[in-house]
Amino acid sequence: MAIFRDQAENHVEHDRSIEDRRRHRQLVEKSIKENLGDILSEESIIGETKNKKYKIPIRGIKEYQFIYGANNKGVTTGTGEERRGDRISSDKRKAISNNKAGNQEGKDIYETEITLEELMDYIVEDLDLPNLDRKKYSEIIVESAAKKRGYQKYGVRPRLAKKKTVMCKIARKQGKKRALREIGEEAEIGRFPFREDDLRYYKVKKHPKKESNAVMIFIMDVSGSMDNTKKYLARSFFFVLSRFIRRKYNNVAFEFISHTTTAKNVNEYEFFHKGESGGTYISSGINAAIDLIKEKYNPGVWNIYPFYASDGDNWSEDNEKAMEAVNEISDLSNMFGYIELLPSTYSTTMFYRFKKEISKKNFVSVTVKEKKDLWNAIKYMLSEELQEKNKE
């Protein structure tokens, strides 16, 4: 005897497409995270608006099905390292690789689009700004978001409290019924429209709150040894970093410094677009940041995070001054980050000297040897684990 069950009342639990949709979302998120490095290495990302779209390849999901084997003898087993979706086979057919021909079935690939704003959402998931220390007198007074504090009879339409308005209308209607019953009349009331007196609006009040001061100081070497590729890598690093921080925090100040043998404060547009040439004194850029800190950002009041990008090619007479400057700015800062771009010879760049001679716990240095290293450098600089280690 056949038994039929009606699943109409709880059809969601028996919707077979739910699992497919969940797996599809996982694949999309996985592909986006795996391609973050490629997106961030695009030169077009610098200065783009939040609605700029980027294409990301995603492997398609196929329905499970039985297929014919190759009539090979023996039994195929796994190695224990397989993941969901891997094909276990002893087939010797070769896949297409290195742009050469093969004889194995390909994978379905399609593209999805993601905006720069959505890209920042995924970056926020993986990265975290160094914790802002609560310093004495370090708070600034900012206006918090408005909070609802009761009701009032006047206000703007967006703040109309609909539920409270309906309750006032019902109370007025019930009051009228009681009045009619008291004078002996029929209490049945027909159409009962809203009146101006029924309207209630949310009363909002903005409360000041304290937030920690934080300033990010971006310093970039724009000398002749910094070719277009190096400058692009530096600007990409700073651009993504600034977008991420602005998205995560509302009250962070930014300062921009570019230098050759001399340094100068520039605005954000000049920092990301203007190029120069000349010799290199690393100390000039760092000393300019030190002067700026002493002038505007008291370390007892501000949380200070300078980041410096260079190819590490410094004029030899300036090396000792550069070492002194790095030590001094590290003492003034919560963290000082040094990014060295496309170093030609490891042992001759400032990265080697800094690693060997700078013992400050809050000094963090990375190298970017090619475009694909950019994303790892950003993660390394801002990883929460790294910051916790630096505090110890």
UniProtKB/Swiss-Prot annotation:
It comes from the Bacteria. Residues 80-94 have a biased composition (Basic and acidic residues). CDD domains: vWFA (cd00198). HAMAP family: UPF0229. Gene3D superfamilies: von Willebrand factor, type A domain. This is UPF0229 protein CPF_1540. Residues 75-100 are annotated as: Disordered. It comes from Clostridium perfringens (strain ATCC 13124 / DSM 756 / JCM 1290 / NCIMB 6125 / NCTC 8237 / Type A). InterPro entries: Spore_YhbH, UPF0229, vWFA_dom_sf.
